[in-house]
Amino acid sequence: MKKNVQIKGTKDGISIFLSDKASISELQQELTQLLADQKQNPYSGEKLEVQVQIGNRLFSEEEEREISTIIHENSQMKISAFYSNVMSKDEAKKWKENDQIFSMATIIRSGQVVQVPGDFLLIGDVNPGGQIRSNGNVFVLGNIKGIIHAGFEGNGNAIVAGKFLYPSQVRIADKVYGFDSEDYKEVTETDLFSAFVNDAGEIVIDGIHKIRKIRPEISNFQGGR
């Protein structure tokens, strides 16, 4: 008969596998017994971190707490994380939102803030004082003179594409690049450029063609002067 609780060593360290076919009470009983049996070989070092794989189910916070308590009190292990093959409705909704491309054809004027959960395509200009916030990438088919914040919730892999003019500012996650120096003040027309965070953790401004190389998953964006 297949055990409902198994402890295995993996390439990522120690993992405890809990069957998604068993009830929580069955798992608690078998886990307690398995850990009690292993106490015959005491370990005196620091507590070892362990991952708990729970299969095609979700535990409530209370159930996670109960499993954590059993492991903490009956072994020299501590849980680093619970891993499930499924996601909650809230997680699924957020994933769907972040995977969408939102688009608008308008002008973002001073004082306006447009915020979207996924990628954003604007056909129009961003005036000084206007701002776009996106959890994903931002593509602007127009002049950028305001603030563009891609990867708003911390996605450092996000990119921005558009015509950057004085006094625009590009933000990607927590990085900032400004076009507010005197060098940019007299520039009234420019080509489309891309902005991204390089391996050194700095925002780089480069040709639009670089998007395909640095972010190959973005392959359908095309733009021209």
Curated annotation (Swiss-Prot):
Keywords noted in UniProt: Cell cycle, Cell division, Septation
Q: Which Pfam families match?
A: MinC_C, MinC_N_1
Highest taxon above the source species? Bacteria
GO terms under biological process? cell morphogenesis; division septum assembly; regulation of cell septum assembly
Q: Which family does it belong to?
A: Belongs to the MinC family.
General function of this protein:
Cell division inhibitor that blocks the formation of polar Z ring septums. Rapidly oscillates between the poles of the cell to destabilize FtsZ filaments that have formed before they mature into polar Z rings. Prevents FtsZ polymerization.
Spell out the subunit comment.
Answer: Interacts with MinD and FtsZ.
NCBIfam families the UniProt entry points to: PRK00513.1-3
Protein name, as recorded = Probable septum site-determining protein MinC
Q: Which organism is it from?
A: Listeria monocytogenes serotype 4b (strain CLIP80459)
Tell me the classification of the organism that encodes this protein: Bacteria, Bacillati, Bacillota, Bacilli, Bacillales
